[in-house]
Amino acid sequence: MRSRNLVLLLIFISQSILAQTVTEMPLYPAAIPGAKISAVKEQIIFTNGGVRISSVITPTLTKFSPAKANGMSVIICPGGGYGRLAIDHEGVDIAKAFNQLGITGFVLKYRLPNDSIMVDKTTGPLQDAQQAIRMVRQQSAAWGLNPAKIGIMGFSAGGHLASTAATHFNMLADQTTKDTTSVRPDFAILIYPVISFDDSIAHKGSKTNLMGKNPTADQVKLFSNELQVTKNSPPAFLVHAGDDGTVPVENSIRYYQACIKNKVVAEMHLYPKGGHGFGMNNKTTNDKWFDRLTNWLNAIQ
């Protein structure tokens, strides 16, 4: 069943390709730091026309190369409450859209927090995000990319991971590495993101999956990323819907306010409706947030 699912996933990705060249690569060249040997198996589920991946054991980075690259790249973290990955409409579809702009897209299949497969599940996803940034920066010359134009993007819980990478780059999740390559992203794109673990606005599923049922006050503060923004945080672009019943819009608002307070360049687009998980297309409006993002990316170059 697993091999059949893998074949179906590869077919799905191949059918999504236009002029792009797609390459899936292991995130780590050898052993995965902090990993445990486990009987857990990766699951690929096709549901309601979408693709979901859970129980990720071996993280990968899939590079979508445009026909003519402009040097900018974005690492994309799909959402799914830190319990699964919406790899299609919050991953592959986004990389395809970036390719139309000449931007190289990287879809990150990151490990989801699980005590069975990692020594510290609170830092496992961040370790993968930091390794992805490190990898792209190290290979930038070979791939024709600008090492100073590497962004990170995330949806929902993937937005929490992206905002963690944007605020915790001085905290190496893999404390065994001797690599000094910078893991600071050059910009962050946060789409209906989980930002805060303040109980009043937290997405409880993401909070529990990442930190367990009884996190300490220090853990909650550490991973409430509106509290971790500094003047050195990268520019941020945020999108959210006011009627989001899953991740309250206050998550984006607090991050935006933290950016303004710390004089970090930020732009936020709030739509009155759209709910949660709309991906590229908020059907309640004719305005396309990806067009707004395109303008912003052109402005920060």
Segments from the language model and where they lie:
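Catalytic nucleophile-loop/oxyanion-hole region of alpha/beta-hydrolase
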Residues: 86-87, 91-94, 110-147, 281-288
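Bacterial Sec-dependent N-terminal signal peptides
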Residues: 1-23, 301
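Short beta-strand/loop motif that positions the catalytic acidic residue
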Residues: 238-240, 244
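Short beta-strand element of the alpha/beta-hydrolase
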Residues: 71-79
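Primarily recognizes the serine-hydrolase "nucleophile elbow" in alpha/beta-hydrolase
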Residues: 131-202, 220
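N-terminal cap/lid segment of alpha/beta-hydrolase-fold proteins
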Residues: 21-68
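C-terminal catalytic histidine-bearing segment of alpha/beta-hydrolase fold enzymes
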Residues: 249, 253-301
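Mobile cap/lid helix-loop segments that gate and shape the active-site cleft of serine hydrolases
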Residues: 42, 46-48, 193-228, 234
